[in-house]
Amino acid sequence: MSSWFQRKFNNFESFVIDVIFGRAEGTAATLFAGFLQVLSFLFSGVVQARYWLYRTRVFHDQPLGCLVVVVGNLTVGGTGKTPVVEKFARALRDRGRKVAILSRGYKSKSPPLWRRALNWITHAAEPPPRIVSDGQRVLLDSEHAGDEPFMLASNLPGVLVLVDKNRVKAGMYAIKKFGCDTLVLDDGFQYLPLKGSLNLLLVDKTNPFGNGNLLPRGILREPIKHLKRASYVFLTKSNGQRDLDLEDLIKRHNPRADIIECAHRPKHLVRFGAGNGTGGANEIEQQPLDFLKNKRVGAFSGIAVPESFEKFLRDLGGKIEFTRRFLDHYRFTSDDFSSIFREAQEKKVDFIVTTEKDAVRIAADMPCPVPVYYLRLEIEILQGAADFNEAVERICFPGAAALP
């Protein structure tokens, strides 16, 4: 793909995302939004038909004979799912469960189309799931694993991480080959072929359901009424103040689900260093959060909601001299970094800051004429901590309480 075409495609994709999230203005945005509304109506019909087929048992979900924890959301965009998956998987591991995280590996590098077509024509055996981590070591880089699976594998020793679009196949593989007794489906709320024991639904408190429309006019993957399938609802990105209207809406659709409020808290800064052989950040230096105070910094990110990352930096006292925003899961090029470092040197910043998710997409041997740090986040339960602990106990000791 030529650089010109790639640039035009990225610009168009950015425009579409801005229309969906309500950030784009002008006549072109209004006309395009009308077109997307028609597509949204068609998409809604497909979603409803699919759920009806599973509900009426025309299509069947498949139990795998072990505990299956589903973590997902109703919307696209950054609800902060990965830190919740990490917190839950770590708690399960620490309580003695043999945990496997199953991910589809969004935007990971797959075999070329011709190879997949040839396998289909020749009826070749399906390849096994890609093993990102066997619990002992990380085996794939972020390009082949996907950003989130690579992050989870790096941060969770003792937890198996598998990537495959067929999560039933991946789950069976984890059970048979590794003896796993607990499966965690990352971004699995819409994955109906595998029956979940417990459904954890994440809702971004700062933008719960967008404009209320389904894709592609809005950010909803399925109707709001499907809140009813959740066992627990995690309100992420909370500022600690209760939103009674949102809680009432959730309870109206799902009176049984416990609501747990949580916030993403900065933990520390990690300096990006020389290669570790797999790509991504090598933790050669950590700095406390007050290291940012009154520092002149540049910021770049390729995430769904860059505003939240930039707000963290400002709230911690950083003086942002420039920002670069890329598309979610964007693969940075050497030209991108040449431009970023050039601006950083021109504006005499002390260092550059990015997100942990973006750091895993940087070549490990990239020279850094200006220091580069990533901001490590962790999840903090603000309200409903007892409910979170109860959820873990119900999974670890299912005999103590019936699963919903």
What label would you give each PLM region?
Residues 87-159:
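N-terminal phosphate/diphosphate-binding loop that engages ATP/GTP or pyrophosphate donors
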Residues 42, 82, 152, 186, ...:
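Residue-level signal for inorganic ion chemistry
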Residues 70-88:
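Glycine-rich phosphate-binding P-loop
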Residues 8-67, 395, 399:
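A transmembrane-helix-recognition feature enriched in membrane-embedded lipid enzymes
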Residues 151-195:
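Phosphate-binding/switch loop-helix module in NTP-utilizing enzymes
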